[in-house]
Amino acid sequence: MAAGTDIGIDLGTASVLVYVKGKGVVLKEPSVVAFDRNTNKIKAIGEEARLMLGRTPGNIVAVRPLRQGVISDYTVTEKMLSYFIYRTVGKSLFGRKPRISVCVPSGATEVEKKAVEDATYQAGARDVSIIEEPVAAAIGAGIDIAKPCGNMIVDIGGGTADIAVISLGGVVVSNSIKVAGDDFDEAIVRFMRKKHNLLIGERTAEDIKINVGTVYKRPENLTMDVRGRNLVTGLPKTVTVTSEETEEALREPAYQIVDAVHNVLERTPPELAADISDRGIVLTGGGSLIQGLEELIEEKTGINTMTAEDPLTAVAIGTGKYIEYLADDDKKSKNK
């Protein structure tokens, strides 16, 4: 691949997506790193490491270096980024490093933004631009954010839900809460423990969420057999879980997201609120794929709610398009 490539990175709690100018999203891997505790050497990164979660011997640890949208382990994040950048652009020719745009939650502090910026430089970037996730999500969802018109984005990742009203290229009102896809998984783990005396891992909880999970009453009550460890006997056990049960399990995190949407709507200027009422609310991020979320938000707000065409890659695409926008701006400046 050519030197000096421009790339956009959606550095998420659950997964990392990389967008390359002219090629689109070229990499999507879980944000998981496995390393040997004795030697401190990395054993696996991405999908290979994710498959090790909950299944490693004592000396191997599989970790997620990002928590709730921000870096929790700087060194591991830097190594993970280096690996993904190398896989994307290969070895830089003539020492020419890529220019990289990275997104952060809208509620990230200056210190948290600086940590992401520094880690990206250390991982091999020539220049680093930071963009807020809701803005990236809006661009990736095909919204023209430069217009003087209110657009509401609800971006639900693995660690955070970012709700923002965007107009004239910037965020007018926003709210970032640390409730998202991972919290849905944790709610299912707690429910299974309390209701069925069954201990399950996060991968099993995610499978339940994807296959039968819902936050709004489904037309039909789906079922799924779930295997785990009986907390009473300590032996393996299989129970049948229904989508009705998951609605109960997921109610609290789902309503926290709805409340955050309400909070932003209440603080939105009247003219922009009228725009949102006409144009609707757009959902992005992997967490938006939970069954029934569109219907729940629409019912509670009275505003038409829709999921972006490709919610999983919207932030990555928007982050990449943002670096293209900056590149175009540079050209215009040089031509003046």
Predicted regions mapped to residue ranges:
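Nucleotide/phosphate-binding catalytic cleft detector across ATP-hydrolyzing
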Residues: 1-156, 164-282, 288-336
